[in-house]
Amino acid sequence: MKILVIHGPNLNMLGRREPEVYGSVTLDEIDAALRERATAAGATLLTIQSNHEGALIDFLQAEGWDADGIIINPGALTHYGLALRDALAMLKAPIIEVHLSNVYRREPFRHTSVVAPVATGQIAGLGWRGYLLALEWLLEEKRA
């Protein structure tokens, strides 16, 4: 089983950027927790973080065709990343959109996701554990 984890712009700054909003856990810590759980389940986890939409699209085009699941936190690309949305739409794997904060309790511009219409589901506001919940769902979905 192959799971892709995609982290969009500014997520490399987790732990330093607005910890009152995003928490104090770093991206490396999130990826380590996901990798530990995936390995225990016999799954392969491939991760990427980029501040550039094109790099995320290149990753999806290279790795997404045979992926069994995709976890994506598009960051600000959530609201305007149409090329990223189109790259996700090409793939057959279930997609879980994750947001650390509850975007619906924040500024109005954050309430719209161009990714949501192509995602299987969305988890928002549960902090870094939202990634783990997404992974658990994907692992269970493939066992069903």
From Swiss-Prot:
Record function comment: Catalyzes a trans-dehydration via an enolate intermediate.
Protein name (record): 3-dehydroquinate dehydratase
Annotated site residues (Transition state stabilizer) in this chain: R17
Family: Belongs to the type-II 3-dehydroquinase family.
Stored Pfam families: DHquinase_II
GO molecular function annotations of the record: 3-dehydroquinate dehydratase activity
Primary enzyme class: lyase
Organism the protein comes from: Roseiflexus sp. (strain RS-1)
Binding site for substrate: N73, H79, D86, L100, S101, R110
Positions annotated as active site in the UniProt record: Y22 (proton acceptor), H99 (proton donor)
EC number: 4.2.1.10
Pathway: Metabolic intermediate biosynthesis; chorismate biosynthesis; chorismate from D-erythrose 4-phosphate and phosphoenolpyruvate: step 3/7
Amino-acid biosynthesis is among the record's keywords: yes
Catalytic activity: 3-dehydroquinate = 3-dehydroshikimate + H2O
NCBIfam families, sorted: aroQ, PRK05395.1-2, PRK05395.1-3, PRK05395.1-4
Domain of life per record: Bacteria
Self-association and partners: Homododecamer.
